[in-house]
Amino acid sequence: MQIKLERNPKHLAWVFIFFTLITFSCNNDNHERKPNFIIIFADDLGYGDLGSYGHPTIKTPYLDQMANEGMRFTQFYVGSSICTPSRAALLTGKLPVQTGMYGKRSVLFPDNAGGLDPKEVTIASALKNYDYSTACIGKWHLGHLEQYMPLNHGFDSFFGIPYSNDMRPEGKWDYARENFPPLPFLDGSDTLGVSLDQSNFIKMFTKKSIEFILENRNQPFFLYLAHTAPHTPLMLSKENKGLSIRGTYGDVVEEIDRSVGEILKTLAKLNIAKNTLVLFTSDNGPWGWANIDGGSSGLLKGNKGSVYEGGYRVPAVAWMPKSIPRVTSTALATTLDLFPTILSQVDKDFEFKSIDGFDITKTLFENTPVRTDVHYYRQDTLIALRHKEWKLFIKDPNPWDDGPKQEDMPLLYNIEHDPSEKYDLAKDNPEIVQKLNILCQDHINSTYKAPSKYEAILPAYQSAYDEYNKK
């Protein structure tokens, strides 16, 4: 039996209106949905450690794909060339001197009583005002007491370790062997265990990150994935050992690359890649004194802890299909800029108070330069300033080596011509030296210096700390 369908113009009209409304609603929902943000922060990865940055033997196909499909920065900088202050700068958009995240010990240790002030506004705490789900996975290192931990800085969840993976009794430092507790692994404020096998950390962090993305695929989210690698001691899973020509260091970097690949694949499967801004970078330059276990600064001078380019300039790739152009960008940008740039995507009228970062939206989406200056600090002291192509040292770059001393200052380099900082041009360019000197003094005079949060030692460690420092 055949069923005859009659065409009723009125019915067709209502069907047309119904589907039009659904289509409009879906398009409107996609248009208005806030973007997701993922920051993947490697630990001690050097400027020259990725295939897309010229490494001859370390294979990083997923990060290279990110670079090919997005924006590869050649002049991207951190807020400090060492761990704790660099992480504070990324999350707050402020130079560490403004938040007190500096000190003679360079970073926070398990015996420290201080940390990042909970009153500081972070990317996570700001995004919570716009109904974002937020997660910190991996390494924190901004204070291990409860009031300084991620849950008090805008993160809904934390899964990882409170400080560096080498701050444990098993290390080579005699003070740590005698005094530091076993390295704790936390889920929120709960300790899952101590002295866990670090060879599984990259896999654990990746799995947890993917779970977070899956759980929040239908709402805006911010994921801060801060790997503990390739910081020493180098640890990686059994199935990834012995795969890289570069040896163990190469194995670790390649496992991080595969982790990035899994996250990108997850975004694609969920059909949210086009609405997710992913940025991969490093907290500072490579650990130069780790020898074969450390990374490469490429053609740049200096390493982690240095005010030379190799300490401050890091690999960085931004990826957001159909939004971020496929280009190698020579524009200046820094981790300080991530806070204002991310918040401007959510609220164009967001008020940024007392921050040092710039909104580099035009750089990210149009490859238009915005930033002109980079400040290089050692603890709370400005050592050098980059202004456009010129970099001026006003203080001794490294008082512990046989290089230039304070009496040799100032030093002037054309960074675009001489990224290795070999040729001092100060005597040939007195007007440029004078101009940059004025910029340095203006910056020093206008920058608030907060008291250091590093100095206080927990009472349980004070006597051992004092005894050790008598030696």
Language-model segment annotations:
Residues 2-10, 26-411, 417-471:
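Formylglycine-dependent sulfatase
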Residues 13-23:
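Bacterial N-terminal signal peptides
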